[in-house]
């Protein structure tokens, strides 16, 4: 019996390796759950183009939008786990379990995490010039007069909202959330001085920072941005446990063979090392971020748990 089991295990391993070696033998779909032209869409197209060149097979980017990015994710979660339907998503996919009452998938269980594409550092932005010369100054002002400081978001439970709440709770101050329909409107209100601060990825904010219309007080990622290296992290600014990462990453349906998951990881990693891809990702505000499938799966699971705790502490209820 022991020999039979050993032979079966060997055959299973050989089959998995053969499947991975044969993959891909037909076009692969890369599902983007948001609109064309977004950072997520651009990143998907840059990497998909390189994967096509590396593997000699077409990687077709499809935008399946709606419901805050959950429709595209649900489509992939329910797709055949054969490696031919890939999802690229963002930090938002780890927030959904805390903010959606009837989520059509389980982020931690319905996906095989492959690897991050990039980290996208979020900046704490204020109008320039501002009465708040530093993040510590902003927090001090908020504590001195509770309720006097407000911040913009693009909707309750969005990544910018969660980032602001992470900072607010760790620093211990009160602030009023003002939701807007989109990032351009939110930034306009900050530039006009009608809103005190706003969290935004470097890519979106950099032109206004360089033009002197906005000032970056800090970055909430664990490391400084290479695009704006003089801007301190929120930890460096003196606020422990205030870091919050924005990232973009790749996923497959949960039961995809591990050899295929590993093959895709290795090919994405290779693609990200190509000079053209590096340059394009950097131009879109992406910072290098690499994890193995196992590391990324663990990271995603911890992020889901952290966001649930954060939403509860901030009084954000599933809708």
Residue ranges and their predicted role:
Residues 4-14:
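Sec-dependent N-terminal signal peptides
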Residues 14-20:
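Sec/Tat signal peptide C-region and signal peptidase I cleavage site
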Residues 20-110, 148, 172-199, 208, ...:
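N-terminal (or domain-start) structured segment
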Residues 25-27, 169-171, 236, 258-319:
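An extracytoplasmic/periplasmic, membrane-proximal ligand-sensing/linker region
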Residues 44, 48, 52, 73, ...:
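Extracytoplasmic/secreted envelope proteins and their assembly/folding machinery
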Residues 78-84, 98-185, 234-236, 247-280:
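Hinge/capping helix and adjacent helix->loop/strand transition within the periplasmic-binding protein
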Residues 93-102, 168-170, 197-231:
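A ligand-binding cleft/hinge motif common to bilobed small-molecule-binding domains
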């Amino acid at each position: 019996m022991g020999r039979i089991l050993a032979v079966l295990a060997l055959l299973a391993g050989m089959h998995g390796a053969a499947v991975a070696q044969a993959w891909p033998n037909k076009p692969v779909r890369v599902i983007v759950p948001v609109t064309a032209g977004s950072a997520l869409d651009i990143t998907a197209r840059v990497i998909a183009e390189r994967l096509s060149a590396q593997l000699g097979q077409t990687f077709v980017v499809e935008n399946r939008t709606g419901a805050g990015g959950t429709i595209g994710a649900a489509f992939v979660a329910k797709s055949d786990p054969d490696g031919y339907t890939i999802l690229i998503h963002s930090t938002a996919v780890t927030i959904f379990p805390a903010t959606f009452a009837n989520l059509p998938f389980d982020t931690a269980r319905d996906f095989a995490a492959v690897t991050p594409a990039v980290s996208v550092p979020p900046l704490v932005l204020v109008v320039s010039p501002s009465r708040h010369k530093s993040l510590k100054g902003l927090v001090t002002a908020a504590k001195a007069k509770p309720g006097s400081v407000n911040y913009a978001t693009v909707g309750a439970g969005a990544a910018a909202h969660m980032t602001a709440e992470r900072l607010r709770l760790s620093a211990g101050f009160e602030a009023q959330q003002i939701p807007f329909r989109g990032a351009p409107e939110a930034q306009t209100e900050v530039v006009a001085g009608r809103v005190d601060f706003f969290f935004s990825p470097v890519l979106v904010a950099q032109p206004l920072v360089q033009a002197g219309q906005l000032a970056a007080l800090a970055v909430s990622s664990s490391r400084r941005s290479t695009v704006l290296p003089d801007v301190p992290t929120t930890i460096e600014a003196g606020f422990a446990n205030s870091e919050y990462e924005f990232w973009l990453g790749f996923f497959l349906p949960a039961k995809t063979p591990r050899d295929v998951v590993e093959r895709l990881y290795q090919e994405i990693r290779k693609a990200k090392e190509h000079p053209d891809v590096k340059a394009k990702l950097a131009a879109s505000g992406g910072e290098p971020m690499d994890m193995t499938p196992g590391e990324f799966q663990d990271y995603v699971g911890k992020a889901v748990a952290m966001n649930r705790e954060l939403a509860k502490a901030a009084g954000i209820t599933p809708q």
